Amino acid sequence: MIFVGNDWAEDHHDVHVMDEAGRRLDARRLPEGLAGIRELHELIAAHAEEPDQVVIGIETDRGLWVDALSAAGYQLFAINPLAVSRYRDRHHVSGAKSDASDAKLLADLVRTDRHNHRRAAGDSVQSEAIKVLARAHQTLIWARSRHTLALRSALREYYPAALKAFEDLDDRDALAVLGRAPTPEQGVRLTLPAIQSALKRGGRQRNIAARAREIQARLRTEQLAAPAALSAAFAATTRATVAILVELNRQIGDLETSLANHFETHPDADIYLSLPGLGVILGARVLGEFGDDPNRYTDAKSRKNYAGTSPLTVASGKKRAVLARHIRNRRLYDAIDQWAFCALTASPGARAFYDQHRAAGDLHHQALRALGNRLVGILHGCLRHHTNYDEQRAWAHRQTTPNTQAA
């Protein structure tokens, strides 16, 4: 058996090959792409007869290079860069670092400590596609939130009447009217037909006349006025931000359609959609981040730990503390947090579980995290047994338990 450390970069890879005793067999720098992967295969073939005799450590689990390594049948370990950094300190305290030494470090790590790490997951291509779309969709939503906050901040400086007229600045009504009247003066001069025309172009189909009268009245309320030059400058930034938000809304809608199409054809989609609080978008996010490799999580606890919902125990001597996990997959945790919140109105059992934790003294987010942890465990059981969610089976055992239990 041989061990290969692969320190990757954008245009090259440093690799280090060693045997079971830790002796160096070869080390070199390879180019990214087809030529580099071909040279790596030839290098490995010179020291190993079968692919399963090759163990590779690399600090990523995605990309064309990683796909090629997995397709070749090598034992691939995707090591968290933070773990690699801690491992480096275990051997060297001087702080010295190089790409070549990192490749050797990775080879040593999978040679001696691979039992403490998991092999790269064997998720399906369909699951990977859902993950790509779900992350892109969520990234655009986060971008929309940032631009909406920037727009709100700008309007506070020169156009407070607009904030009274529109509660949601990323809404189609707000964007349509602000795009037409980005200054207070233009807002005051807007006629009802002009506002109605803007609302129609924005996509509104009902209550147009009533909404137009409401907007006109609020835009014409008295307000403090900024200097003309400053107002004109802010108007330019408002027009730009409105244009960005309009396009973001369009692209988010397109991605949402594509994401739904991919998710609904996945074999596990029905199981995810059967769970309370999970719709198409949230279900796709959760599936994409968890993946669909049936052997990735050995038990429910492993899935909960990966989700970051399970409590973390820190004990030393007589001191013991149970804390929330903060090193976690942010995208997955965000989706589970929303899932737990939505489940409160969709599942009586989830609501009772949440209320029990609140009654025991937990704050809202603590109780929500405990509920999310419980829901992840239920999801694991459904996927393991290939069965849809059943409200009675999921919560019946808790109805006879008077005290709140840890999820």
Tell where the protein language model's regions lie, with residue ranges.
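A detector of single, family-specific signature residues
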Residues: 1-407
